[in-house]
Design a protein with these regions (language model features):
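Carbohydrate-active catalytic/glycan-binding domains of CAZyme proteins
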Residues: 1-187
Length: 187
């Protein structure tokens, strides 16, 4: 594994730059912050921002002259544009799914129904959590290593293949799943 101990931000890449009207140039990119020594990135991919500048010969470079993603950068001279925080709780009493939700590799609207039973999110099961194709996982990104999570469940499994519950999901091979299921031996 590649790890540079000189930077808290690792795996930087997949970015886009913007030239602002005030002359500033910024780059937003994906990154991760691994926990040492395991180098596990519990919070997954995050978005970072870097102050950039164009060189005289037309190359884009980091304004600080380095090549490592910086955890902290100088502020823009643009006026503040406050962003409303995402709600920490959802009763699913809207007909629209909030922007804080996503699903691995598929559109959550392909398996989530908010209209059939107001106040609930009805998920139509598809493939297992290990699937790379159509796992019905309605996800919300953790933004802190300390969190309290919970869910309410109304589910009656009819087969050993039916499960529903709460999942802490990193990827299709790394997750913790607390679920209700049908046991053929326990009935």
């Amino acid at each position: 594994r590649y790890f540079n101990p000189e930077s808290k931000l690792q795996k930087s890449g997949h970015g886009s730059y913007v030239d602002l009207p005030n002359g500033e140039t910024w780059l937003v990119h994906l990154t991760s912050r691994p926990f040492v020594p395991e180098l596990r990135c519990t919070l997954g991919r995050e978005t970072a921002i870097q102050r950039m500048e164009w060189t005289e010969d037309g190359w884009l470079r980091m304004k600080d002259g380095g090549n490592l993603a910086q955890e902290f950068v100088e502020e823009s001279s643009l006026p503040e544009a406050p962003v409303r925080p995402l709600p920490s709780h959802d009763d699913f009493d809207s007909e629209e799914l909030g922007i804080q939700y996503y699903a691995p590799r598929i559109d959550p609207l392909s398996f989530v129904d908010l209209k059939a039973r107001p106040g609930w999110a009805r998920l139509r099961g598809q493939e297992s959590g290990c699937s790379l194709n159509k796992a019905s996982i309605l996800a919300r990104k953790l933004t802190s290593v300390q969190a309290t999570v919970g869910t309410k469940l109304d589910f009656t499994p009819l087969s050993y293949q039916h499960t529903a519950g709460l999942i802490l999901y990193y990827d299709n091979m790394n997750f913790v799943y607390l679920y209700k299921y049908f046991s053929e031996t326990l009935n």
